[in-house]
Curated annotation (Swiss-Prot):
Residues that bind S-adenosyl-L-methionine: G73, L78, V124, E125, R139
Compartments (UniProt record): Cytoplasm
Species the sequence originates in: Erwinia tasmaniensis (strain DSM 17950 / CFBP 7177 / CIP 109463 / NCPPB 4357 / Et1/99)
Gene3D superfamilies: Vaccinia Virus protein VP39
Name the record gives this protein: Ribosomal RNA small subunit methyltransferase G
GO cellular component, one term: cytosol
Family under the similarity heading: Belongs to the methyltransferase superfamily. RNA methyltransferase RsmG family.
Any Pfam family: GidB
Keyword Lipid biosynthesis found: no
Annotated EC: 2.1.1.170
InterPro entries per the UniProt record, alphabetical: rRNA_ssu_MeTfrase_G, SAM-dependent_MTases_sf
Gene transcribed to yield this protein: rsmG
Keyword rRNA processing attached: yes
MF term (GO), any: rRNA (guanine-N7-)-methyltransferase activity
Amino acid sequence: MINQLSALLKTAGISLSDRQKQQLVGYVEMLHKWNKAYNLTSVRDPQQMLVRHILDSIVVEPHLIGERFIDVGTGPGLPGVPLAIVRPGAHFTLLDSLGKRVRFLKQVQHELKLDNITPVQSRVEEFAGEPPFDGVISRAFASLNDMVSWCHHLPGQQGRFYALKGVLPEEEIAALPAGFRVENISPLIVPQLEGERHLVVIARH
C-alpha cells in the first residue's frame, strides 16, 4: 500500500517523509480494521481510502494558515488525522459527538504516536474553544451557514473557516450570514478522484 500512496503523492506533487507515509498507511489500516465493527466510513476498500480519505484531506494543507486548528464533525478523523500527520508542527483538535469515533481516534493517537491531535467528544455548540483557534475545518459536516453559525465562537478574530466541498456551493455562499465573507475559493486536484472538489475559506468582516 505504501507504494500506491507514494505514486499518488508523486502525481499530486506532494513530498512526505517515509515516517509520514508509514503513519498515513497505518491510519488507513486501522480505519479498515475498525470499520468492520464500528462502521466509521462507507468506503470499504483500503486502496480507495488512500484516494478518497488521505489524498482528499492532505491537498488542503498548503492552504491552512496558523498552528491551532479544530476539525468539527471529524468522524473517524477526516481530514484532521491526515493533516496532523503532514503538518506535525501544528495542533489539531478533533471534535465529534459520537463516542465510538472518539475511542477510535484515541487508539489512532496511541498507535501512531500522534502527539499533535486531541480527540474530544462533544457537540460543537457546547465546546468552548479557549484559546481561540486559527482555523475551523470541516469536511462533509454542514452547510456554510450552519458551519459559521454553530462554530462562530471557535476561531479568533483573525481565524478562518475552511470548508471542504464537492461542487462549488454557490447557493450556500450567497446565504452566508452578515459578518462573514468568502476570502478564497480554491479548486482542489485529487488524483484518481472523480467529481469536483473545492476548498471554501471564510473570514469575518
